[in-house]
Swiss-Prot record:
Mg(2+) binds at residue 107. This is Xanthine-guanine phosphoribosyltransferase. Xanthine binds at residues 110, 153. PANTHER family: XANTHINE PHOSPHORIBOSYLTRANSFERASE (PTHR39563), XANTHINE-GUANINE PHOSPHORIBOSYLTRANSFERASE (PTHR39563:SF1). It is found in: Cell inner membrane.
Amino acid sequence: MSTKDPHRLPHEKGFHISWDQIHRDSRALAWRLDGQGPDEGAWRAVVAITRGGMAPAMIVSRELDIRTVDTISVKSYHHQAQGQAQVLKAPDAGLMGDGTGILVIDDLVDSGKTLELVREMYPNAHFATVYAKPKGRPMVDTFITEVSQDTWIFFPWDMALQYVEPYRGTD
C-alpha cells in the first residue's frame, strides 16, 4: 500500500507526451488493430472520443485507410477533476448501430467512466486507447502503453513551449 507524499507536487508524477510520441504511439495502435476488424479484418468506421481521441483517431484512420470518421463528445473532467460522464454529442445513429465494426478511439482510459458510458451505448464496438491506467484497463480492448493510476499525462495539445521557473531551487 502506498501513501501519497504531501510534499510532492502534482507535476512530479507527470508523463509528458510530445507530438512525435503521440504520433508514434498512435501508429503503433493502428498496427495492432490492423486486420482485427469483424469484416474480414476490416473496420467500418472510426469514432473519436473528443477531444483527446481526435488526434489518435485521425492517425489510426489514416494508417488503416478508414474514410468514415465521426465523433462522440463526452465530458467527464472539469479542469483536472473528474466528474460524472455525460454525452454532449453522439455519432450518427445509422452508422453506429450496436457498434459492430466500429473502432472507438481515445487518448487515455483513466477511471474507465467515459468508456463505460460509451460501451453501454455501443456494446459491440472495439475500444482502443493509446494509454491506459489500471482502473480503466478493463474497459479498453486494445491499448499501447500502461501508466500507473497516480500518473498525470501531459498531452501536447495541453502544453505550451515556454521557459518555466523551477519549483525548487534557484541556482
